[in-house]
Amino acid sequence: MADKITSREADYSQWYIDLVRSAKLADYSDVRGCMVIRPNGYAVWEKMQAALDRMFKETGHVNAYFPLFIPESFIAKEAEHIEGFAPECAVVTHGGGEELAEKLYVRPTSETIIWSSYKKWIQSYRDLPLLINQWANVVRWEMRTRLFLRTTEFLWQEGHTAHATPEESQEEVMRMIRVYKTFAEEYMAMPVIMGRKTDSEKFAGADETYCIEAMMQDGKALQAGTSHNLGQNFAKAFDCQFQTKEGVLDYVWATSWGVSTRLIGALIMAHSDDRGLVLPPKLATRQVVIIPILRGDKAAVLAKAESMAAELKENGIPAFVDDSEQNSPGWKFAEYELQGIPVRIEVGPRDIDKGVCIAARRDTLEKTELQLDATLAVQVSGMLSAMQADMFQKALRFREENTREVTDYETFKSAVEEGFVIAHWDGTAETEEKIKEETRATIRVLPEESDYREHYHMDEPGVCIFSGKPSSQKVVFAKAY
Amino acid sequence: MADKITSREADYSQWYIDLVRSAKLADYSDVRGCMVIRPNGYAVWEKMQAALDRMFKETGHVNAYFPLFIPESFIAKEAEHIEGFAPECAVVTHGGGEELAEKLYVRPTSETIIWSSYKKWIQSYRDLPLLINQWANVVRWEMRTRLFLRTTEFLWQEGHTAHATPEESQEEVMRMIRVYKTFAEEYMAMPVIMGRKTDSEKFAGADETYCIEAMMQDGKALQAGTSHNLGQNFAKAFDCQFQTKEGVLDYVWATSWGVSTRLIGALIMAHSDDRGLVLPPKLATRQVVIIPILRGDKAAVLAKAESMAAELKENGIPAFVDDSEQNSPGWKFAEYELQGIPVRIEVGPRDIDKGVCIAARRDTLEKTELQLDATLAVQVSGMLSAMQADMFQKALRFREENTREVTDYETFKSAVEEGFVIAHWDGTAETEEKIKEETRATIRVLPEESDYREHYHMDEPGVCIFSGKPSSQKVVFAKAY
């Protein structure tokens, strides 16, 4: 079973690493900075992929696959892009036993290689929009790594779209950041703030970057997804022009957007506890474990457990029985709490006599008596739905309790150690940089949602927390992963 | 629409490339030897992945993800393995702006990186079997490339399993090659011969390689999947020992097995024709296109087409309407034949008056009148099932017609230019090599299936086609992709 997991209170960072490794979600590999995503962790990624892929297709996107390698000259075509990415690339210099004439970068992101194809595919407005997504691995050389959150190689999806007008591309940017918000909140049960990044935090090569930001249990922020308005930057870099409806030539308008296996780290940090993983039911491959208490008429108990599992599965609830006799029920309880199975059901001979079983929810650890009758699947389904909804509400409450509106810099400095801080900013990169230097807090997001803006009075004018200069709006500061 | 596709008769190789590019399945990229899998091609891969992934899970496997990079010293640990793979690897020498202390190979296959993890995960027989699959990209430097069939980077799945006994690992090897055979025949409608490879054709590092071999329309063979019995080779290379039930230490027994995007090339070469792609319905994302003939009461025709599509979709048949007025019905017929939509339905005002529509099957181009009544979905479903079955039978007949049993070397030399040749072989690598040098034909497979062996009298003793020495069995020779 599990090695002991450090408590969150004792050492939050160590708790995270202990949990990831004990629950067999991921492990460091023998390759510097690269992780192995173990089957338990990969199963979560598969559930995420399935939900996201469906949402991408419902919004008109198709999947494709572009090369892993990018010629050095391609990366260099977009000035900000190469400045942002070149220093963190892995570089292939030899292939097939020979030194290459041109170095190949292992993709850190695929704008350049994709736009070199789009240039060939797009001639006229009739070829637009082009709405393509790719599921792939990418590599960014990292000095300090942390499983799922920051590794040299990670898995992600990257959408790359091409449009005839800036209005359409901006619509796409917003559509996709909203898809991410819906996914984060409805599947991951993780509330997120949707909004814009400041210029200094945006993607290298973008005109504008939108993001969703979540709060972890230590009060830090985690950027959970981004959607970029690339303007005509990459079309110009790759000379990708099209004939408009009006018959003139124009450069194509572009977006890109992505989420990665980082989301698994976010999921863990948002919900899990000192016993192990807490998984929202919608992302659990196995939602219910049934543990038979093998006393008295063992065969009858086991048969009951199996028939319960069969009934749940017939009703679309993935359930399984752990009937191993080498481990005690107590050991199993701990093991499945560690693994984050959303609902545990125990059933013994006395329960069967009474026509009941005991179900425990992983998030609250609350036990409920369920009736062993034809409504079993309905009862369990109700527990799972309630758990999904309650996890979101709990995380939302936590975020609200750990968000402070602050007006003086001294309070600001202590407040950013605890959670999100809403404060006035004078809009300059200098102030942003100085605050970062002094506190390590950054501007996470300029929220776009009116209910959030109103709740925190973000549109009331005031003075900058740092410079004292006039400020037209408040922004969200936090320390971040 | 499509550029003209060269006919198979005129130039089979050019036909293939023309088809792949005209149907927008894939394209060469600006990176040497690497392809772009375009949305139409990737959709086929997604259908293949879904079916295979389900079959892997039904046989007890789970997915995981291991690093892209393999330290040079790992590849070197298994002697045959490094000899086979090192010359065709892409090598990363720089990362994060600095030269690396140890070179990293971009994985050509993952046995070594995976066994370096398995060593940590396996201590006792209780940890076995370990049944893991990975969906990933791999890189093998290729001098002469061909879209899907041979490219520097390709996508695949690689299963890597660990077992306590050689019997169990051999069972796994056979289970998975049979899964591949089932997939090839039931989904791809492509008959395959299942059997063993000779020593010279087996995987670098395997004790034994099993394969499925298919015949393309030019009579050449294509290896469509392999399953390797790795013995204890990788366990020994990585010092991966476990405590047996009996309490002694032993090395773990291993298998690996894989199929790749090469299957898309096989699918095209097995079934397609001079008009374009012919897709078996089970691998078609869009199974039915409805083309309204927009004459007379256009709105009524369009409404009928839409209601037909809705009815088909409700019954699980993915159908869509092409109602664009800028292209003629004739243009659309050609376009969807090129794209390989299995069934095309045309419906016009006169059809509606008569209560019928005209459906055409892509494989035979045969037209059938369907009744526009409540049984429409049943009628279409019947067409799709018949098409799936007929495509398999046609390919099987083709293989049988192009397989010859040959007893003299002169006939052999001309026969291998046409198709598969069943002939006696003395069992030596020397003979195998000389035949390859003289004819470019190789021993594709030592069939394992008794019906195939009996049909071609493979177990009757005789004399080697080349050396005249005694031979205990016949084998299958062919030129191959």
Curated annotation (Swiss-Prot), chains A, B:
Localisation: Cytoplasm
Pfam families: HGTP_anticodon, ProRS-C_1, tRNA-synt_2b
EC top class named in words: ligase
SMART domains cross-referenced by the UniProt entry: ProRS-C_1
Enzyme Commission number(s) of this protein: 6.1.1.15
InterPro entries linked: aa-tRNA-synt_IIb (IPR002314), aa-tRNA-synth_II (IPR006195), aa-tRNA-synth_II/BPL/LPL (IPR045864), Anticodon-bd (IPR004154), Anticodon-bd_dom_sf (IPR036621), Pro-tRNA-ligase_IIa (IPR002316), Pro-tRNA-ligase_IIa_arc-type (IPR004499), Pro-tRNA_ligase_II_C (IPR016061)
Catalytic activity line of the entry: tRNA(Pro) + L-proline + ATP = L-prolyl-tRNA(Pro) + AMP + diphosphate
SUPFAM superfamilies named in the record: C-terminal domain of ProRS (SSF64586), Class II aaRS ABD-related (SSF52954), Class II aaRS and biotin synthetases (SSF55681)
MF terms (GO), sorted A to Z: ATP binding; proline-tRNA ligase activity
GO cellular component: aminoacyl-tRNA synthetase multienzyme complex; cytoplasm
Regions annotated as coiled coil: none
Biological role: Catalyzes the attachment of proline to tRNA(Pro) in a two-step reaction: proline is first activated by ATP to form Pro-AMP and then transferred to the acceptor end of tRNA(Pro).
Subunit-structure text: Homodimer.
NCBIfam families in UniProt: proS_fam_I
Domain notes from UniProt: Consists of three domains: the N-terminal catalytic domain, the anticodon-binding domain and the C-terminal extension.
Protein name: Proline--tRNA ligase
Gene for this chain: proS
